[in-house]
Design a protein with these regions (language model features):
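Short, hydrophobic beta-strand segments that form beta-sheet elements in well-ordered domains
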Residues: 37-38, 72-79, 193, 248-251, ...
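ATP-dependent carboxylate-amine ligase
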Residues: 1-29, 45-50, 60-63, 143, ...
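Short internal beta-strands
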Residues: 70, 74-80, 249-252, 394-397, ...
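Acidic, Mg2+-coordinating active-site environments of NTP-dependent enzymes
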Residues: 82-88, 201, 210-366, 443-446, ...
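Residue-level signal for inorganic ion chemistry
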Residues: 20, 49, 68, 107, ...
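N-terminal leader/targeting and accessory segments in enzymes
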Residues: 1-106, 255, 282-284, 304, ...
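Short, conserved loop/helix-junction motifs that constitute active-site signature segments
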Residues: 69-71, 87-89, 206-209, 239-244, ...
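Phosphate-binding loop of NTP-binding sites
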Residues: 103-252, 256-267, 513
């Protein structure tokens, strides 16, 4: 795939400030301007943009207006505080409103024309774990059917084969609408979006209407933002309203999925892995090894869909089943989907970066890199690898700083309960003391009687130590970094690849890496 820095439509239309002001309820000052794009930071400004200057944690966006204008911005949208810093004689085209952030979706939709009829089908996925995997599986299934596709995930964004970098689970509203506009002009048939609860709270999905919204699961996470599971579910539930989506598919493997489905005011299809759970569709794994899984899906009228994919674990199969049902709910015939997958024998042609991704080859130990950063994700990954491993399971784990600290002891306890050896290391500390983060994981891990627990701060040394412990028949899994290409240390993005480090450790130990 090709790579590009800034994701924008190439044949955009323009909207004048005089048109935009009443849409936003904003006051217009200075001359008019023809706006062709929207930017929130100076690094993403393209000539013809309106620069949106918001209040940040440490500074106001208006402080960077000069840099935005030098980059090609034609106008600025800001709040009263931002406007007050400008000279009364300023000739900069200006829109002023009370809360510019809440209007980003309205502005971007108007500028990029994404509300027009005839756009691609939009598939949005939310939940605690499995969002990224489900989006990649959706995209792979659509591509197998011959569709032009686009996706937006934590790992990357892609439109019709061109990749763009990703820094947020769900981009800001201007970036989403720019992507949808580019998808439309690229004749894309289906777009798969990863949607976080934080994005819904911050209006990033405003004026984005999904064809189908999918729910994976809900477990303890992000209490720093939501405080309780009930509040967390409420934030996710905002996606499943008449204003946001046409229909829903909900996995009921967790009680929170059952609760969400019961509250739906839109058409909903339910899915579960256990026949003990009431659902319209059920999935069952029929075959699994270190390389792939095969499963059956049975519908309410006895419909059967058999699929295969290079994924591991019941949790990943649940994601794949959810993706398939989202497509079926959008109008795709079961036979069409089945035929695209080679009748179920060839499988879903998917590569999911950093999600139980195997980096080893040959007859040596199995080594995986995963993005798990919650107790529930640890449990699913470790239980899967335990079933597939004849020898020992060695786990390297760390977690993010400046995030929910209450989950860390729980994660550590799960790790030490299910793995034979646990090595706690640094991951993505952000502005938190890495030793404090490790201490939270170690507290839980060391509470398990007889647990073999090590603390190695340097992640490169941690993975090398893990590989030194294993032999053929054993498994190493490094949970946390996934496909991330950097570590956030005191606000600085330091280039780093866990996958590259794991491969290097394997080769240096005399094993074969992928």
């Amino acid at each position: 795939m090709a790579h590009s820095a800034i994701l924008r439509p190439t044949r955009g239309t323009s909207r004048s400030l005089r048109e935009l002001a009443p849409l936003l309820g904003a006051s217009h000052h200075g001359p008019d301007a023809a706006i062709t794009g929207v930017a929130l930071n100076t690094s993403s400004v393209v000539a013809g943009d309106i620069f949106v200057a918001l209040q940040g944690l440490n500074s106001h966006g208006i402080d960077h207006l000069e840099a935005a204008l030098e980059a090609g911005a034609l106008a600025v949208l800001t709040d009263k505080r931002g406007a007050s810093t400008l000279s009364s004689s300023s000739e900069i085209p200006l829109l002023v409103c009370e809360d510019p952030r809440s209007l980003l979706g309205t502005l971007a939709s108007a500028v990029y024309g994404t509300a027009a009829e005839g756009g691609p089908r939009i598939f949005s996925v939310t939940g605690t774990n499995g969002k990224t995997s489900t989006v990649f599986l959706l995209e792979a299934m659509m591509r197998a059917m011959g569709w032009r596709t686009a996706l937006s995930t934590t790992a990357l964004r892609q439109v019709n084969g061109v990749e763009y970098s990703s820094t947020l689970t769900t981009p800001e509203a201007p970036d989403i609408h720019a992507m949808l506009a580019l998808a439309r002009e690229s004749d894309v048939s289906g777009v798969a979006l990863e949607v976080s609860a934080q994005a819904l709270n911050k209006n990033r999905l405003d004026h984005v209407r999904s064809t189908v919204a999918g729910f994976t699961n809900l477990s303890h996470d992000h209490f720093e933002d939501f405080g309780t599971m009930e509040n967390y579910l409420e934030a996710k539930a905002a996606l499943f309203t008449k204003d946001m989506t046409d229909r829903a598919v909900v996995c009921c493997d967790t009680p929170w999925g059952v609760e969400l489905a019961s509250r739906m005011s839109i058409p909903v299809v339910t899915l579960a892995g256990s026949m003990d759970i009431s659902a319209q569709w059920h999935y069952e794994i029929t075959q699994a090894d270190h390389e792939r899984s095969t499963w059956n899906m049975v519908g309410p009228a006895g419909q059967v869909l058999s699929l295969s994919a290079p994924i591991l674990g019941e949790h990943m199969v649940a994601n794949a089943a959810l993706a398939a049902l989202m497509l079926i709910s959008s109008g795709v015939e079961i036979d069409t989907l089945k035929a695209a997958m080679g009748g179920g024998t060839e499988g879903v042609p998917v590569y999911i970066p950093g999600r139980v991704e195997k980096v080893s080859q040959g007859s040596g130990p199995q080594v995986y890199v995963d993005a798990a950063r919650s107790a529930d994700a640890y449990e699913h990954t470790l239980e899967t690898l335990r079933r597939l491993t004849s020898g020992a399971v060695v786990m390297v784990c760390g977690t993010s700083g400046n995030r929910d600290a209450t989950k860390r002891p729980i994660m550590g306890k799960v790790a030490a309960t299910l793995a034979d050896v646990v090595i706690v290391t640094d991951d993505d500390p952000r502005k938190e003391d890495p030793a404090v983060i490790r201490a939270g994981l170690l507290e839980g891990a060391r509470s398990v009687v007889g647990a073999k627990v090590h603390e190695i701060a340097d992640p490169s040394e941690a993975i090398r130590f893990a590989v030194s412990l294993v032999d053929p028949g054993d498994t190493v899994v490094w949970c946390g970094p996934g496909s991330q290409s950097y570590r956030d240390i005191q606000g600085v993005h330091v280039p780093y690849s866990a996958r590259a480090q794991a491969r290097s450790a394997l080769r240096d130990a005399g094993w074969t890496a992928s």
